[in-house]
């Protein structure tokens, strides 16, 4: 484990890029063989806006990486944060706790807030307005959302006191996890259900992408499912009944245009409606 952390402490940008491309490529190919839905779409055309926003996310994270490194170095050298206040533990436990709480503060918490605060929801709407959710949807985030997510990651590092090796390992696992749980793949139902007791499975996250409440406001986790189960935000829904998108912004053509998506956070707010299935 120490060797792994030492590698991630100095992981080259080229290796992180390779991880991103490899994950996308793997799940892209897998989608063609074990698809959950057979979308009638041009997969490459659909991917263009999603890859554009993936690129903007990469640029923002690259430009602000010095802040992540600076805060991590500061908390580590000053023995500040939860991980530094704990008694000496085996390194694997320390790493696990770091990733667990970074997932809470850096992923679950901002995601939950984006669904509860109207201006944040209008920003996050760009992610939800994809009508054919697949692995390219994973990083379909408006640049403003990328800034929000990055800020919460900084807060997570400050609170946990995680060293940069743990932070980079967390971000790498988070990347693969979000590519996996957005991928248009169909696992055996029992396998998916078992997986969802510990991690965010594809079916679990797809429920979050159903087009109407209350399912849209559920399953906020990214890596671990414990936070949704602990805070009462977990919901299950039949994957065969899923409809992607958002009920009040259902113009599929507009939701596939980069220029429209960039302006989407500044559109008038429309109150979502509830799904009749939630009453069953």
Segment roles from a protein language model:
Residues 1-4, 77-84:
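Membrane-interfacial helical/loop segments at transmembrane boundaries in membrane proteins
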Residues 1-13:
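Short, strongly hydrophobic alpha-helical membrane anchors
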Residues 10, 14, 43-46, 161, ...:
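Membrane-water interface of alpha-helical transmembrane segments
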Residues 15-19, 42-55:
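Loop-to-helix transition at the N-terminal end of transmembrane alpha-helices
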Residues 19-29:
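Hydrophobic core of alpha-helical transmembrane segments in multi-pass integral membrane proteins
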Residues 28-47:
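Membrane-interface helix-loop junction between the first two transmembrane segments
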Residues 53-68, 75, 83, 89-244:
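Membrane-embedded catalytic scaffold of the fatty acid hydroxylase/desaturase
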Residues 242-280:
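A membrane-cytosol interface segment of integral membrane proteins
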